[in-house]
């Protein structure tokens, strides 16, 4: 079975040299630089390394895990070593998810270029593969792993070992019968196409075959009309035309004769079901499909907390990599904590902690470079400034000189605005959020309203500094603060704050009477949640005309996250997350912003944009129309083995479905577990949910490995907005804990949404 990459591997000069192997230094820090021998494996999909040229090698990384390749000049670590290592000989391998970058130093510029070109070629090839090509490559990878003696053939003993690796528990006699049927050459081994036939027999899906035959008159093919009937009746694509059905046949039918006859074979039908058209996520929601001309405060905005940190909040590393990763995943609001640094250069770090420091100008340069690589819509720099007057001037100079035309330094067209501009009007602009001087303030310093230093850095009990003082006590505190020696706000920096002036929140009434649409308040998660419970409707109305930013509790020193859904329910636009930390909360955030082109802006439902809205997230009442969701969890495909330390174990998978939305809609149900089958488990169970406010609901599908002795192990998940869900027979392609695709791992479900009557709290 020839690999899809075989042509390139045998003809491309760079790939040929990479297969021979080269020595390179692996760089982790200024003091850790080790010589290693790296070699591209013959499958073209994995790179191994060894301590010595002919020493025992082990896997270093898979090409499918690589996001991009950067040259040495773009590496924060390699730049710090520029005096001892030539940057032209270095390069960085950036991985998907949260895996640390791999910095390498070649022996020459030419060798570095060979690896950079070769790796980028392989990454581009993998990225451009369609479903069938990915499946073929996946099969090729498994064949390579199963063929222990690398002779291009697989004995039955090797096949048995491979089945175990693939999570298949199968009767030996049945496995041998499949093996013999595939061994058409009768050589006692499987080669190339014989292994493909063995795999097809192994993965024959009775549930899909049954579905296919229920719509096919002859059980062999679906005619154009039969396929159209399936799309309209089962897939609930009522507006589907025969032209669209024909387009799908042309796209997924593998045989030319089938395309000419306008029919879909069983293979074509399965290919359609496994494609993006058969995915649970509606393809119509993937591009930018929402109105982007409304004021900024009408959108949920993907936001990051302490963006510079790639670890915990007390001792973690500060790095520009945090900004690169946040911006490339579509984040549109990043945080910058700035303090006085040596030699007059401001630095960014988590004040009063042991976190490392990076230069403010490096952060600004990174934002300038990466701000609009993923999305053209505006980026907000949330400044927390703790600098002296002089270093504030330096900050203003860096922002102006480095960002140039990208920086919004005046109102649009110089006109006095009456509302916030829209994302469309602010395309490719960077906005500064921070404190701003006014004539009334007469250059007096106003205490930063958000993220009190005690809460963030000294970890006093949260309640001590999140309890709002009485007005009289507040005034005394403010006077006392002004007596202390504090840096005065520099006019040059103040003038760069155009639409996003930070102000202290006192009450919703006070905001209505004294504040303007271009001002923004920040809330700790605890305070925001309390306000939702005590005055949920007022909070919703507040967020229809002014922006709110919510940040994690200072007690989350491990960089854990809160559930953003609770804050979105009240219309809070900027719910800042610790993006370096994977988990349920980030799954919800990623799933929410997967829609609308992943541009980082999602239009809020109309009832969260109406200033007269009566909506209360804790008490949703009519006119919201409830919906009932029926999910038949049918089967799973090629689920990975999660805990490789459990020798000889095969997963016992179960599926958990979670709903996140308003409190009354939050629910979870799960299937039974299937014993010893991660390859093609079958559940056939139906779960039922009733949701009052579908516009705010998120669905999370989680596959777990059941363990009666301890906690179930996580296998994979997929999270999406209710409004982006397709009905009918759909595949859910699973993601890892880090959000990386686990293809071809998936679950097969049937989705049915029934409209309910007008719902209330009951």
From Swiss-Prot:
Domain of life of the native organism: Eukaryota
The PI-PLC X-box domain, residue ranges: 290-435
Catalytic residue list: 305, 350
Region annotation Disordered: where it falls in the sequence: 443-483
A single BP term in Gene Ontology: lipid catabolic process
The protein's required cofactors: Ca(2+)
Residue ranges of domain PI-PLC Y-box in the record: 493-609
GO cellular component, one term: plasma membrane
Tissues in which the UniProt entry reports expression: Highly expressed in skeletal muscle and kidney tissues, and at moderate level in intestinal tissue. Expressed in corneal epithelial cells.
Gene3D superfamilies (alphabetical): C2 domain (2.60.40.150), EF-hand (1.10.238.10), Phosphatidylinositol (PI) phosphodiesterase (3.20.20.190), Pleckstrin-homology domain (PH domain)/Phosphotyrosine-binding domain (PTB) (2.30.29.30)
Gene Ontology terms for molecular function: calcium ion binding; G-protein alpha-subunit binding; guanyl-nucleotide exchange factor activity; phosphatidylinositol-4,5-bisphosphate phospholipase C activity
Catalytic activity reported: a 1,2-diacyl-sn-glycero-3-phospho-(1D-myo-inositol-4,5-bisphosphate) + H2O = 1D-myo-inositol 1,4,5-trisphosphate + a 1,2-diacyl-sn-glycerol + H(+); a 1,2-diacyl-sn-glycero-3-phospho-(1D-myo-inositol) + H2O = 1D-myo-inositol 1-phosphate + a 1,2-diacyl-sn-glycerol + H(+)
Position of sequence motif GBA: 213-243
Subunit structure, as described in the record: Interacts with GRIP1.
Stated name of the protein: 1-phosphatidylinositol 4,5-bisphosphate phosphodiesterase delta-4
Organism name: Homo sapiens
Lineage: Eukaryota, Metazoa, Chordata, Craniata, Vertebrata
């Amino acid at each position: 079975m020839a690999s899809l990459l075989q042509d390139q591997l045998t003809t491309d000069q760079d790939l040929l040299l990479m297969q021979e192997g080269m020595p390179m230094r692996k760089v982790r820090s200024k003091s850790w630089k080790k010589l290693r021998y790296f070699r591209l494996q013959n499958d073209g999909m994995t790179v191994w390394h060894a301590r010595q040229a002919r020493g025992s090698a082990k896997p270093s990384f898979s090409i499918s895990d690589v996001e991009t390749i950067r040259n040495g000049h773009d590496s924060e670590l390699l730049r710090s070593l520029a005096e001892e290592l030539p940057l032209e000989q270095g390069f960085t391998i950036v991985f998907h998810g949260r895996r640390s970058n791999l910095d390498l130093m070649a022996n020459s510029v030419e060798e570095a270029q060979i690896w950079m070109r070769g790796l980028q070629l392989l990454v581009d090839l993998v990225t451009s593969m369609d479903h069938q090509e990915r499946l073929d490559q996946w099969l090729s990878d498994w064949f390579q792993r199963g063929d222990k003696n690398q002779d291009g053939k697989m004995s039955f003993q090797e096949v048995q070992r491979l089945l175990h690796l693939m999570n298949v528990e199968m009767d030996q006699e049945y496995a041998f019968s499949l093996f013999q049927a595939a061994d058409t050459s009768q050589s006692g081994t499987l080669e190339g196409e014989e292994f493909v036939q063995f795999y097809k027999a192994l993965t024959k899906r009775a549930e899909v075959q049954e579905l296919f035959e229920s719509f096919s008159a002859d059980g062999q093919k679906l005619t154009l009309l039969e396929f159209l009937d399936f799309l309209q009746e089962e897939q609930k694509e009522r507006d589907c035309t025969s032209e669209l059905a024909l387009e799908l046949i042309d796209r997924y039918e593998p045989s030319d004769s089938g395309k000419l006859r306008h029919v879909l074979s069983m293979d074509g039908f399965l290919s359609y079901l496994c494609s993006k058209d058969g995915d649970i996520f509606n393809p119509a929601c993937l591009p930018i499909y929402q109105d982007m001309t409304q004021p900024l405060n009408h959108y949920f905005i993907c936001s990051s907390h302490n963006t510079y940190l790639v670890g915990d909040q007390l001792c973690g590393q500060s790095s520009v990599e945090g900004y690169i990763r946040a911006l490339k995943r579509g984040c549109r609001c990043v945080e910058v904590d700035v303090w006085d640094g040596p030699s007059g250069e401001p630095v960014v770090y988590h004040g009063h902690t042991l976190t490392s420091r990076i230069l403010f100008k490096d952060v600004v340069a990174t934002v300038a470079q990466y701000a609009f690589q993923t999305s053209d819509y505006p980026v907000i720099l949330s400044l927390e400034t703790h600098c002296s007057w002089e270093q504030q001037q330096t900050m203003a100079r860096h922002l102006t000189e480095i960002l140039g035309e990208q920086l919004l330094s005046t109102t649009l067209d110089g006109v006095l605005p009456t509302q916030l501009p829209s994302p469309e009007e602010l395309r490719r602009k960077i906005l500064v959020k921070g404190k701003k001087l006014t004539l009334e303030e007469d250059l007096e310093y106003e205490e930063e309203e958000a993220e009190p230093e005690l809460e963030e850095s000294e970890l006093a009990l949260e309640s001590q500094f999140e309890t709002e003082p009485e007005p009289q006590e507040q005034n005394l505190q403010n006077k006392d603060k002004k007596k202390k020696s504090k840096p005065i706000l520099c006019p040059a920096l103040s003038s760069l704050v155009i639409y996003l002036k930070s102000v202290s929140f006192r009450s919703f009434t006070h905001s209505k009477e004294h504040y303007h649409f271009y001002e923004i308040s920040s809330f700790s998660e605890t305070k925001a949640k309390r306000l939702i419970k005590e005055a949920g409707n007022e909070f919703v109305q507040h967020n229809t005309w002014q922006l709110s930013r919510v940040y994690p509790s200072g007690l989350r020193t491990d960089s854990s996250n809160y559930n953003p859904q609770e804050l979105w329910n009240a219309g809070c636009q900027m719910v800042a997350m610790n993006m370096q930390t994977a988990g349920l909360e980030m799954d919800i955030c990623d799933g929410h912003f997967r829609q609308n082109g992943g541009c980082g802006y999602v239009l809020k439902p109309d009832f969260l944009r109406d200033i007269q809205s009566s909506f209360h997230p804790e008490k949703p009442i009519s006119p919201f129309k409830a919906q009932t969701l029926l999910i038949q969890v049918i089967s799973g495909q090629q689920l990975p083995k999660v805990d490789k330390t459990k020798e000889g174990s095969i997963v016992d998978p179960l599926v958990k479905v979670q709903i996140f939305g308003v409190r009354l809609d939050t629910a979870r149900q799960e299937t039974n577990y299937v014993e010893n089958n991660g390859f093609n488990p079958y559940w056939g169970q139906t779960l039922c949910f009733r949701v009052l406010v579908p516009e705010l609901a998120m669905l999370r599908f989680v596959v777990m490995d059941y363990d009666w002795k301890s906690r179930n192990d996580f296998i994979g998940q997929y999270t999406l907005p209710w409004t982006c869900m397709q009905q009918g027979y759909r595949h859910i392609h699973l993601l890892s804990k880090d959000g990386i695709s686990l293809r071809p791992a998936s679950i097969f479900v049937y989705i049915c949404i029934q409209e309910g009557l007008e719902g209330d709290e009951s």
